[in-house]
Amino acid sequence: MSANKLKVSVISPEKILYKGEVDSLIVPGSEGFFGILPNHAPLVATLGIGILEIRKGEKLKVLSVEGGFVEIKDNSISILTDHGALKEDIDLEVEKKNLAEAEKLPPSDSKNLFLQKTKTRILVASR
């Protein structure tokens, strides 16, 4: 592996979402987004709900992630997410329908969490 690259694995309980060498990442941490470049300091952090951006050259790959952990060590990045989806695996029309139905429900913490996850998947699918 080149010293200018990051070895990245993004894994959910269902499948390996991404595996490869990349130039940089933008990760949705539980306390906010943070960037990862080669030679980043070692770190273990929790993931929030959000968009994970993976950049390799001019190509940008986006995924939705819903919690989990990220570990950075020696240019190797392991992302374990509770649930994740690649842009191409998200059905935009289904997510829009889910959003419309959820917005009709009475306020609750579970509704807010569902809305946040659904809106993230819609953003990923729309990019």
UniProtKB/Swiss-Prot annotation:
How does the record say this protein sits in the membrane? Peripheral membrane protein
**What is this protein's function per UniProt?**
Produces ATP from ADP in the presence of a proton gradient across the membrane.
A Pfam family assignment: ATP-synt_DE_N
Q: Write the record's keywords in alphabetical order, separated by commas.
A: ATP synthesis, Cell inner membrane, Cell membrane, CF(1), Hydrogen ion transport, Ion transport, Membrane, Transport
Q: Which GO terms describe its biological process?
A: proton motive force-driven ATP synthesis
- Any single GO CC term annotated in Swiss-Prot or TrEMBL for this entry: plasma membrane
- The gene name on file is atpC
Q: What is its main location?
A: membrane
Q: What's this protein's family per the entry?
A: Belongs to the ATPase epsilon chain family.
Q: Name one GO molecular function term.
A: ATP binding
- Kindly provide the name given to this protein in its UniProt entry: ATP synthase epsilon chain
Against NCBIfam families, the record matches this protein to: ATP_synt_epsi, PRK13444.1
Q: What does the subunit section of this Swiss-Prot or TrEMBL entry state?
A: F-type ATPases have 2 components, CF(1) - the catalytic core - and CF(0) - the membrane proton channel. CF(1) has five subunits: alpha(3), beta(3), gamma(1), delta(1), epsilon(1). CF(0) has three main subunits: a, b and c.
Keyword Membrane in the entry? The reply is yes
Q: Where in the cell is it found?
A: Cell inner membrane
